Amino acid sequence: MSVRGIRIWRRNDARFQPSILVEKNGLDGSLLFQGGAIATLDSDSTDVERRSYQKIVDAYGILGVLAITKDEAVLVAVTGVLSVGQLYGADILKITNVEFISLRTFGSVENVDSRIIDLQRLLSSQMFYFSSLQSYDLTRSAQHRDSHDCSDARFFWNRSLHFSFQRYGIDTDNWLLKCMAGSVLVRVVYVGANTGRVALISRLSCERVGTRFNVRGANYLGNVANFVETEQLLLFDEKECSLLQIRGSIPLFWEQPGVNVGSHKVKLRAFETSLPAYHRHLSQLQHRYGEFAIVNLLGRKEGERVLGDAFKTQHKSSHFAPLVDFIDFDYHAQMKISKEAIVQLKKKMSPHMTKHGFFYSMGKEIVKRQTGVIRTNCLDCLDRTNAVQTAIGLQMSHDQVAFLNLNAGKVNVEQRVEEILRDLWQKNGDQCSTIYAGTGALDGKSKLKDASRSLARTIQNNLMDGAKQESFDLFLTGAAYDPRLFDRACNILPPSLIQESYYYHEYADAVSQLVERSPEIAEPQSIKIFVGTWNVNGGKNIHNVAFRNESSLSHWIFANSMTRLVSVEDEQLADIVAIGVEELVDLNASNMVKASTTNQRMWCESIRKTLSEKAPFVLIGSEQLVGVCLFLFARPRVSPYLKDFAVASVKTGMGGATGNKGSVAFRIVVFSTSICFICSHFAAGQNEIRDRNEDFATTLKKIRFPLGREIDSHDVIFWLGDFNYRINLSGDEVKNAVRNGDYAKLVENDQLTQQKALGQTFVGFNEGQLTFAPTYKYDTFSDDYDTSEKCRAPAWTDRILWKDQRKKGKTQLLSYDRSELKTSDHRPVGAVFKVETFKVGGRKCVELIEDVVESMGPPDGTIIVSIAGKPRFPPQMFPPIHEKLKELGAQVQLSKFDDGDLWIVLNSGEMALAALSMDGLKIGGTDQINVKLKSPDWAYALKPHLSDFDLESFEVTAEEEALLGGTDGAVFEFADEDEDAISVSSLTLTGSAPDRPRPPSARSEAISVAKLEWPTEQPNVLSTSMPTRASSASLANSSWYEHVPPLAPPQSNNNKSPPQACLFNPFTQSAPSPAPPPSTIPLPPTRGASVGPGPPAVPVRKAPPPPPRPVIPPRPKNM
């Protein structure tokens, strides 16, 4: 493979559309790329065609075709390689340089898209490898090659680049390379007259790939970040011996937004929402590797303790607990005590190593199979993980050498192999670390070296990882067509189909049909969503207890004016609650540099407790950008159907330089409907209309979720916040209109209403009728509008808008009103929506796919035309046939003569089916044309073949529903040393904390939740909003296996009081609250507002013990 066997030619004649010709040594003919289509040419046609082309590059191989935009695609050619050794007679080559050749333009592709430079840097970073021979596929381990014929999709990185070739029936094995990412290290060992090889191959999965602080934990499918399968391979003569180990991020929903050197602060998502992902990840391991054991190396410092406790609790709550051994080993702490501590860990792992064994074959005979693997992880799955995997590999190498019978007469072979492997494992750790963190591994041998690498990692993570992450996403997914269309297809179709079939990447028309017809196979599921926004004026009165008995957060969230959210009679609760808070902290210089999260945690806890008055809720996410904070809660019964949660934010203050103004956004998929929530705080001032419009435009443009998703990529969008749009009237005019209830006059002069009508902002968004008084600006703790010297005119600054982008979208506004909470100069606003989502079943989806595939015609769009009675098609007949095709509305993308016939590639399969109507026509009155399809059996070839495991990975199983069916979640203790380390709670919002010892400073009288309104005073002991330690009592009392009820409203029980949690009171007792000052402007009475006391406290009931965990038999071992 040292010779560049690929020659690439280009036709530079501007009179014709761009065209590329590719030739390869050892193959007759060539490939022709033209008009977005690909065709093979025979040798004679190639010789003729080449005369009008110029050679542009010689290459070692082709990775495939990558669509970088909807209108631009590039051919990716490998132009630089390094050989790392030979395995199975094949050269193993490391890619050191690539070149992109535009297929649709004549100029340089770098001028078309600036991302190409970053992508070229990624592909040339020496992390990609390929084999020179088809017979050895690097993506498969030795045992996998014996049991599977196809490549392992997890490690086949350029799989999507093959799709264009597969669409047009090109043999990819002959023309394209298969590359994997990771590390390949090969050494030669001489044993007497025989030569053997020792290799270490680490295959990085592409299913959830990214850089260190961009991608952590698991996604909803159970794929984890930095998942690496490492194969320790010994080859001697015809004998091969293979040992597999795996590593991967902790399979929970968590992230680590580290910006400091050595930072280990962790943000965990809702504990309960991780359960389905955890179950799916372990099911995948069982399906692919058989038995496995988990080795957790997390420590007890900072966020690692939080994450480690959550990991252990999750595993103990899983039905895998009795089947999968969980070995917990604080690597850093134990190794500081003694370097020999690793021996104790090896003793714990030894039974598993002995039981699982390794793969061994002689020639074509399988002597021994590996029956399981050890899964090792630390925080990054880098340094500590590599050390432990090295220990496992070295210990098992002795048995491998013994099986190969290499010690006979050569006493030192075992020692030589161990020395080679020790060196390979060290280099393997460096290479894996470089991919994920940007530097080599920290081995602990040199403090100066480790410190410099930590600093380099920090610079890498904060300055360069964003571009690298974008390059990963572009290389793996491309940008063939409308991202919203593809995103909707991903929500409807089983993931295995999207990953493994070219059809859904290459044929946009078919995907559009699938999305449009998805209601045919969907089961409607109506959910209720409460959306609220409140500018809390910097929390200036957050510690004021004087007025805490006057009003409650429940009057906002559960206001009687919004009885369609909560009704005592039928207990119809919202399924999802989204609450945005603006000016959570003072917008001063220090907070703009690093905003305190104390108020965020306090508000999160108070909203959580308020919700728990009615029913259990799970906190899905909480994110703060200086003063803007967004909270998202969901009922546990819908949690199994939530997926793809992501967070994004953008600063808009001072032209985007500061976060005193800005937006925070969440995205989430409910069943198959994608929903986006955006909380914004726009520019202030009576006349700064243009600035507010620009803030909206900036937010719409710059909010980006993973895989390039935008705000407009979603089915349903809720936009809430303090938009600061004013009313173009004087203060007296506004107040008089409020007194008279003349809101129509105010609406006519409302800036947001006017700007929407002009198409300057919130185009396409809807808003409920403004039938309540302006929400700004009030004197605090008063019903008086601003009486200060500035005397600002009242305005509807606080708004909630929405947009449903589905063709038959059914999002219904049930209520839109304000609440009378007076601790801020703004009044909170709330809205209740009924959103129709769709639950899609995998088996029904297969039926729809088959129907669409058949109706859309062959994806290659190719017809073969011949003249009856003539052995060769006469070229002069092409123009009249071209005219006939135009009459049908078909566009010719490419044509060629092949074996005497005319081959024509049309713009779609539907046009190919339409062209069959020309069969039997007579051209010129005498010549009869025959028309047939190149691929008449396309429907059978594209028929989806989904295993039960594929469908289980797509659908929510009864087991996963049961995992989230409990009404009492695990209870955690909180520690003040974790301030700012974590930001969201993992508790379900019901039940009570078990009695446990507390320090004297933290003890106080217990009060009921009903009397606890929003935060009124900073507690003596700050509680973080994520778990730090799981109490043993919580594990004993947590009920994880209760069945999840259907989404129908639960039956009412008016005789039963709402559940309440008994909490320690962090507030001091105070005198009775004084009456509020009189109102100078009589406001319309709040519809059905209630200011009475909350429901009475009920006795605390202990959760029942969990039922016996079901013992699930292991799946068939499938390596």
UniProtKB/Swiss-Prot annotation:
Region of interest called Catalytic, as start-end residue ranges on this chain: 532-826
Biased composition (Pro residues): 1073-1085, 1093-1119
Keyword Disulfide bond applies: no
Keywords of this entry: Cytoplasmic vesicle, Endocytosis, Hydrolase, Synapse
Disruption phenotype: Viable but small with slow grow and uncoordinated movements. Synaptic vesicles at neuromuscular synapses are reduced, arranged linearly and are dissociated from the synaptic active zone. Several defects in vesicle recycling including accumulation of endocytic pits at the neuromuscular junctions and accumulation of coated vesicles predominantly at synapses of neurons but also near the Golgi in cell bodies of neurons, muscles, hypodermis and gonadal sheath cells.
Catalytic activity reported: a 1,2-diacyl-sn-glycero-3-phospho-(1D-myo-inositol-4,5-bisphosphate) + H2O = a 1,2-diacyl-sn-glycero-3-phospho-(1D-myo-inositol 4-phosphate) + phosphate
Presence of the UniProt keyword Hydrolase in the record: yes
Region span, Disordered: 986-1005, 1042-1119
Record domain SAC: where: 119-438
GO function terms (MF aspect): inositol-1,4,5-trisphosphate 5-phosphatase activity; phosphatidylinositol-3,5-bisphosphate 5-phosphatase activity; phosphatidylinositol-4,5-bisphosphate 5-phosphatase activity
Primary location: cytoplasm
Subcellular location: Cytoplasmic vesicle, Secretory vesicle, Synaptic vesicle; Synapse
Membership in a protein family: Belongs to the synaptojanin family.
Annotated protein name in UniProt: Synaptojanin
Native species: Caenorhabditis elegans
